[in-house]
Design a protein with these regions (language model features):
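DG-centered beta-turn motif at the end of beta-strands
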Residues: 6-10
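Terminal accessory/targeting
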Residues: 1-3, 13-124, 136-281
Length: 281
């Protein structure tokens, strides 16, 4: 069973309408919602009556923290400003780790509380740029879940088998990202085995082909997956095109990524998959 998933829903209204279009006219049947977005409530109204799986897109990258004023290490000038690499290093330096851990824990707790009205039967969790895989972040998240008795049914584990992409041209940086995330996934699964045993188990695709999730590549990928497997395939079809919204983006990486022509390519891939009856989904 495939979950065709779109991240970043709720970031901006028009951007979210583009994802909505991929639900109505494409194969998207799951979205991750941005818990710290000031536009989330408005964007959630667009989904009224839609049969779509919701996931919390825990966010330590884009926009302002919900714990503004209490997170000096992970934000500055009113917005998040902590890189993946820095948090990876911090994860293994004890005297720094504690400071970041406490701030991250408070922020994750507030983000989960902020979206409580949309999750009546338990939470599904992932994160922007997969930050939740970082040791200090995952440890904080696990403690938030445990200490608050939060019912969680799924946490995305962005672990991929590169053999699945044989013959598909992958960007070298994506290969590196996959190796890093696979290593972090093994660490988290090993440390929190009892926690993961309670979750829905899904295989994942979306980092190796990031920037290359075009129709032909996705069609090839689907043909290699056993239809009986529980599989999440990740897209980012939510382009940010409005000048006023582009100006509101706080992450330079997000600005480049969300304004890229690749967002339209992925949008079209979701629609072509729905239209092509030769592709078994």
């Amino acid at each position: 069973m495939f979950e065709f998933h779109a991240d970043d829903y709720g970031l901006f209204p028009e951007q979210s309408r583009r994802i909505l279009d991929c639900i109505e006219n494409g194969v998207i049947n799951g979205v991750s919602i941005m818990p710290n977005s000031p536009y989330l409530k408005e964007c959630m109204e667009f989904l009224s009556g839609k049969d779509v799986k919701l996931t919390v897109h825990l966010n330590l990258v884009e926009g302002a923290p919900l714990t503004a004023g209490a997170c000096e290490h992970i934000s500055g000038d009113g917005a998040f400003n902590i890189s993946f690499g820095k948090l990876l290093i911090v994860s293994y330096i004890p005297f720094l780790r504690k400071k970041y851990y406490e701030e991250i824990k408070r922020e994750l707790e507030e983000q989960i509380k902020a979206v409580a009205p949309y999750f009546k039967d338990g939470y599904r969790l992932d994160s922007h740029v997969h930050y939740h895989m970082l040791p200090v972040v995952f440890d904080a998240l696990a403690d938030v879940i445990r200490e608050n008795g939060i019912k969680v049914t799924y946490i995305r584990v962005p672990s991929e088998d590169l053999k699945l992409y044989k013959g598909i041209k992958l960007r070298p940086i994506n290969r590196v990202k996959v190796m890093v995330l696979n290593t972090l996934a093994r660490r988290n699964r090993r440390k929190y085995k009892e926690l993961f045993d309670k979750f829905e188990n899904k295989k994942f695709s979306g980092v190796a082909c990031s920037g290359e999730m075009n129709y032909e590549n996705v069609k090839t990928l689907i043909s290699r997956i056993d239809a009986s497997e529980n599989f999440e395939i990740l897209f980012h079809p939510g382009a940010v095109l409005e000048d006023e919204d582009i100006a509101r983006l706080t992450s330079k990486d997000d600005m480049a990524f969300l304004t890229s022509e690749n967002r339209h390519t992925e949008e079209m891939a979701t629609k072509m998959l729905k239209d092509n009856k030769d592709v078994e989904i």
